[in-house]
Regions:
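Conserved Nudix-box catalytic region and its N-terminal flanking loop in Nudix hydrolases
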Residues: 37-48, 58-99, 103
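Residues immediately flanking
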Residues: 24, 68, 168
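Short secondary-structure junction motifs
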Residues: 60, 76, 109-111, 150
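A short coil-to-beta-strand element that immediately follows conserved catalytic motifs
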Residues: 108-119
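Nudix hydrolase/Nudix homology domain
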Residues: 3-6, 11-14, 77-79, 83, ...
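Acidic, metal-coordinating catalytic segment for phosphate/diphosphate chemistry
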Residues: 13-58
Length: 196
């Protein structure tokens, strides 16, 4: 019954982000947690990751990376997946992926343009802005191969500082040897490489 669904919550006039708590297989447990609480407690939740790729002149691929805004609650100023975001409580994976691309980059993609390549389990603990942060996510990973001109993107300033194209192999090396400031899981990046 749609009338029994909590659709909006605010605290001091600021909208709160709610996540469905999930099990290891990605099934919703029926519990919902607020974003900050989920990240404080290390609660398992869903995210969507969209990797935008293009062929390059070296017969390889370039990957579009976004540089996270300095005001992000985790990994500020780090290079990250082309477009990524949490799945809000009650939302589906594909609608979340399409929404994130539109909100962060201004790309109006269609469902048939996203290629599902797998899921990735990511966990880490750190401290950002003086607060503990325990991420525990199950990411649904997609490739997007449509032409993208970064000059035409409309970046969400609160989320994304800039975007750059980087050669896939150069990016892989930067992730592995730590020369690229990033928050990319090496295992997920390998998954992308296998799908190219």
């Amino acid at each position: 019954n749609k009338s029994d669904v909590l659709e909006y919550v605010a605290l001091n006039g600021k909208p709160m982000e709610l996540f469905d708590v999930i099990d290891e297989d990605g099934n919703k447990t029926g519990q919902v947690k607020e974003r900050g609480v989920a990240h404080r407690d290390g609660t398992l939740h869903s995210t969507v990751h969209i990797w935008i790729v293009r062929p390059n002149q070296e017969s390889g691929y370039d990957v579009l990376l976004q540089k996270r805004s300095e005001c992000k609650d985790s990994n500020p100023g780090s290079y990250d997946i082309s477009s990524a975001g949490h799945v809000s409580a009650g939302d589906e994976l594909m609608e979340s992926a399409l929404r994130e691309m539109k909100e962060e980059l201004g790309i109006h993609a269609r469902e048939d343009q996203l290629q599902f390549i797998g899921t990735h389990r990511g966990q880490f603990e750190a401290e950002f802005h003086g607060k503990p942060f325990r991420d525990n996510e199950r990411s649904t990973v997609y490739l997007y191969r449509e032409p993208v001109d970064i000059k035409n993107l409309k970046l969400q300033e609160s989320e994304v500082e800039e975007v750059i194209w980087m050669d896939f192999e150069e990016c892989r090396k930067g992730i592995v040897d730590g020369t690229l400031p990033n928050c990319i899981y090496e295992g997920e990046f390998q998954m992308v490489g296998k799908a190219l």
